[in-house]
Amino acid sequence: MDDMFFGRFGGQFVPETLIEPLKKLERAYKKFKDDPEFNETLEYYLRNWAGRPTPLYYAERLSKKLGGAKIYLKREDLLHGGAHKTNNGIGQALLAKFMGKERLIAETGAGQHGVATAMAGALLGMKVDVYMGAEDVERQKMNVFRMGLLGARVIPVESGSRTLKDAINEALRDWVATFEYSHYLIGSVVGPYPYPVIVRDFQSVIGREAREQILEAEGTLPDAVVACVGGGSNAMGIFYPFVNDRVRLIGVEAGGKGLETGLHAASLNAGELGVFHGMLSYFLQNEEGQITPTHSVSAGLDYPGVGPEHAYLKDSGRAEYVTVTDEEALRAFHELSRTEGILPALESAHAVAYAMKIAPEMDKDEIIIVNLSGRGDKDLDIVRRVGNV
């Protein structure tokens, strides 16, 4: 794997004008990632501001009810901000600060990454502009309000389908014009190199902690690690420290209303090779290669592609990727809430649902770790509308 590619995936498919900013970012990242002052500062904020390490919790009642493997939950829902997004938000914002940048640009769909960027910007005294499709601004009013409270400016994007992919285009356009003093803070393991590597590294704290915690709790590594996959950062973060171990890595995509309906967001299961957002990966696209609309009950999984390292892990056979439907995810949401007193994000509920599917087929001494990537408060409206399953 050369630096820029994971197998054949990844790369830098960007206009000439972005090559220089990306080079500068790569150089800065390589310099600061081993810099003691940078790492001590990041460590300090992760511990005292964000609340790391997060617990690894044995879901005893759920495990016993299913009657198979032991299910452990990596509690990223307890992180400041309510989801794993904070790890990358503070990591990249601090990197930008060390690079001498004074402004952060982000794009957001469901608003979670926008909130994480706004939080980090407020903490470090940086200006934050968040691009958001006008459609999403309507759908995610609370997160728009939250970003405003944190001092960020939300810029609604009226072009194209007025959703995430249009927000991405606007954010890139802004960065080309302002990179001297702005950093483009990408929210997942996507985009042109070096972003997939940077985001994976900042999220790997999840897997490093989980690995230590399970060895302490059980004296052995898990048999399987399960995480939901949209762009793929929470999954990459928990998978990466286990890649060289004999551990099944299972990514769960949004099956929506079923793959056969076309209403889903499962790029690894149903997508084609393509180039978008500066990278070569799997995308949901039509015959003309245009990105097609996605559907999921969970707004955070509806990215139309997937990070290049996941594409590589799939093609190499190191990880397996499955789908869970809206209905199965909602069922898992209710089951975890009632059995363990934890309301998961609908994204994370996809991973819980798949763990619930495989646990009964496994032995009682086998172990599954589920990355509980976020809490469910933001989804209560949707759950109320959909009703009980």
From Swiss-Prot:
SUPFAM superfamilies: Tryptophan synthase beta subunit-like PLP-dependent enzymes
EC top class, as a word: lyase
Record-annotated disulphide pairs: none
Cellular-component GO terms for this entry: cytoplasm
Enzymatic reactions: (1S,2R)-1-C-(indol-3-yl)glycerol 3-phosphate + L-serine = D-glyceraldehyde 3-phosphate + L-tryptophan + H2O
InterPro entries membership: Trp_synth_b_CS (IPR006653), Trp_synth_beta (IPR006654), Trp_synth_beta/beta-like (IPR023026), TrpB-like_PALP (IPR001926), TrpB-like_PALP_sf (IPR036052)
Cofactor annotation: pyridoxal 5'-phosphate
Enzyme Commission (EC) number: 4.2.1.20
GO molecular-function term, one example from the UniProt record: tryptophan synthase activity
Protein's UniProt name: Tryptophan synthase beta chain 1
Organism: Thermococcus kodakarensis (strain ATCC BAA-918 / JCM 12380 / KOD1)
